[in-house]
Amino acid sequence: MRDVLEQCDFLAAVFDMKAHRVSADFAIMTYGDQVFQLHSDGTYHSNPLRGLLPENPPRGAGIEIRLYDTDPEDAVQRAIATGAVILVDPTDKPHGLRKAYILCENGYAWVPSTQL
C-alpha cells in the first residue's frame, strides 16, 4: 500500500471494516470474521515481491477482493463519497449475485456482492 492509514479510512468508510494495530506501515483489518493485513510498500524492502511492484500505475491490476454479503448499492454510495472510482455499478449477474466493482486509490478492485 502506498498509504496504509488512507486505506484503513477507505475500508472503514466503504465496507465498515474495523482497523487494529494501525501504523503508517501496517494494519490488521477485520471484515466480519475475516482478517486482512495491510502493509506499506516500505515494509517490503527485502521481500522479493518488491521487485514486482510497478513504479508507475497501474497498481493492483488483476486482483479482485470479493466481499460477499455486502450491499453493493450501499458500498458504491459510500465509495463515491470517498472519491473512489466505480468501475461497474451494481449489476445482477446470471450466476446469482448482484455486485459492483470499486477501485481504491491503491489500485485494487473491491467487489461487494449479495445473493439475488
Regions inferred by a protein language model and the residue ranges of each:
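Conserved active-site tyrosine of GNAT-family acetyltransferases
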Residues: 7-12, 79, 107
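Short glycine-/small-residue motifs
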Residues: 109-112
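Vicinal oxygen chelate
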Residues: 17-70, 74-103, 114-116
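Conserved beta-strand-loop-alpha-helix junction that forms the acyl-donor binding cleft
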Residues: 1-3
